[in-house]
Amino acid sequence: MWVLLVFFLLTLTYLFWPKTKGSGAKYPRSLPVLPVVGSLPFLPRRGHQHMNFFKLQDKYGPIFSFRLGSKTTVVIGDHQLAKEVLLKKGKEFSGRPRVMTLDILSDNQKGIAFADHGTSWQLHRKLALSTFSLFKGGNLKLENIINQEIKVLCDFLATRNGESIDLAQPLSLAMTNIVSFICFNFSFKKGDPALQAIVNFNDGILDAVGKEILYDMFPGIRILPSQTLENMKQCVRMRNELLREILENRKENYSRNSITNLLDIMIQAKTNAESNTGGPDHNLKLLSDRHMLATVADIFGAGVETSASVVKWIVAFLLHYPLLRKKIQDAIDQNIGFNRAPSISDRNQLVLLEATIREVLRFRPVSPTLIPHRAIIDSSIGEFTIDKDTDVVVNLWALHHNEKEWHRPDLFMPERFLDPTGTQLISPSLSYLPFGAGPRSCVGEMLARQELFLFTAGLLQRFDLELPDDGQLPCLVGNPSLVLQIDPFKVKIKERQAWKEAHTEGSTS
């Protein structure tokens, strides 16, 4: 018995003790490492991970490492090193680590966001980018689709005029319909249970991700029961059942002469692969229903919650800074008025609004730490050696709050993105990557930027957004999951008198 126990402990020590580094190699400074548990006892246990990593830079520098179980992770908190990882050596660091919770989400690394580097990821990213190119003009112009959902949202909010409400649900419904049009070429009708179901699935998944971090750090304990993981699996199963039903319906109605959405593009790619006309990357195995569903789920997950979350952050900051809101509304009144919807072409005139959006993305980035990358070959970052299969985390929070790069980074200052005259947008620092960069950059960046501008402009054109009756200001700390979520808050919706007068005149003329 004792012999077996000693053998077991020696085996664990061999597996989890850091291996001897190559001669002459220089590695990033590491947190202390113990057998089996690695650096876990030395990682801060309170607070948010991105902030803790930022504080660790004071001791270990802008690039450091730690070890959990048998896995080494390198953390980057400098924009030059981050761009080396994301851009200069983007292909070398384009892998994704195997993480239990994300494997559940991605059906074992299918789709785009959590897929490992390889032909499948490259193909589905290419198909997603091709889809967004459909929406650059004509009847499918993305701006028109967004503005239609903004009108539906604003008409609903007008029925709650004078009330204090939480915008989370109506914003998620609006964003879901936009993504639905991109993926399926249809929007859900008001009250459709499928629409509410998708929102509920996304909420359930977001609630689960990050709660079971020990299962991600130590895969060996996955045999232990977890109610959170079971809830997550159930949400994913129900989501996939709904998406599979939509996919089957789209297959039946597919026409190669009318390609209007993501499912059409993927079905077309599969049809071409079956007839050997799709090119070498169009492998039938990579275009299975499960691969398609994973990609659609990625677009929904990223396209709905990220934009909805940022709009909520923008509204929260406007409640904290009512004079800023008034200045933005004055610019909207002067440059747009009340007789047409805001357009992307108005960005050059509404520079304070655009600067506010950029500052929100700096101050409270959607993903304070980017989804981890993985070195697919032996490589280097700066002067340091990085072994193959090392995980690399870019701490966006550190980039966006670096005192050497930003003037008073802990203050919310939209004017930092404006020139001294306040009339031109500028880039005050290179340490700014709200959507990542390189091969793994956000495929929906164009969609997100348009949504943030048009939703904020549309809301402020029609409504005054004020503190609720209890006077409670939103908490601006946030809770990180897949995205940095703001705590629930309420805002009083008041339809603007100038808007009502303009539309009363229009209806009687």
Swiss-Prot record:
Name used for this protein in its record = Steroid 17-alpha-hydroxylase/17,20 lyase
Pathway(s) where this gene product acts:
Steroid hormone biosynthesis; Steroid biosynthesis; glucocorticoid biosynthesis
Highest classification ranks of the organism: Eukaryota, Metazoa, Chordata, Craniata, Vertebrata
Protein family (similarity comment):
Belongs to the cytochrome P450 family.
Where does this protein chiefly localize?
Answer: endoplasmic reticulum
Binding residues for heme: C442
Q: Where in the cell is it found?
A: Endoplasmic reticulum membrane; Microsome membrane
Keyword set, alphabetical order: Endoplasmic reticulum, Heme, Iron, Lipid metabolism, Lyase, Membrane, Metal-binding, Microsome, Monooxygenase, Oxidoreductase, Steroidogenesis
Q: Which Pfam families match?
A: p450 (PF00067)
Q: Which PANTHER family match?
A: STEROID 17-ALPHA-HYDROXYLASE/17,20 LYASE, STEROID 17-ALPHA-HYDROXYLASE_17,20 LYASE
Gene Ontology terms for molecular function = heme binding; iron ion binding; lyase activity; steroid 17-alpha-monooxygenase activity
Query: What organism is this sequence from?
Result: Sus scrofa
For whether the record's keyword set contains Calcium, the answer is no
Catalysed reactions listed for this entry: a C21-steroid + reduced [NADPH--hemoprotein reductase] + O2 = a 17alpha-hydroxy-C21-steroid + oxidized [NADPH--hemoprotein reductase] + H2O + H(+); progesterone + reduced [NADPH--hemoprotein reductase] + O2 = 17alpha-hydroxyprogesterone + oxidized [NADPH--hemoprotein reductase] + H2O + H(+); pregnenolone + reduced [NADPH--hemoprotein reductase] + O2 = 17alpha-hydroxypregnenolone + oxidized [NADPH--hemoprotein reductase] + H2O + H(+); 17alpha-hydroxyprogesterone + reduced [NADPH--hemoprotein reductase] + O2 = androst-4-ene-3,17-dione + acetate + oxidized [NADPH--hemoprotein reductase] + H2O + 2 H(+)
Function comment: A cytochrome P450 monooxygenase involved in corticoid and androgen biosynthesis. Catalyzes 17-alpha hydroxylation of C21 steroids, which is common for both pathways. A second oxidative step, required only for androgen synthesis, involves an acyl-carbon cleavage. The 17-alpha hydroxy intermediates, as part of adrenal glucocorticoids biosynthesis pathway, are precursors of cortisol.
Q: Which residues bind substrate?
A: N202
**Which regions span the lipid bilayer?**
none
Enzyme class of the recorded protein, top EC level: oxidoreductase
How the protein is activated or inhibited is described as: Regulated predominantly by intracellular cAMP levels. The 17,20-lyase activity is stimulated by cytochrome b5, which acts as an allosteric effector increasing the Vmax of the lyase activity.
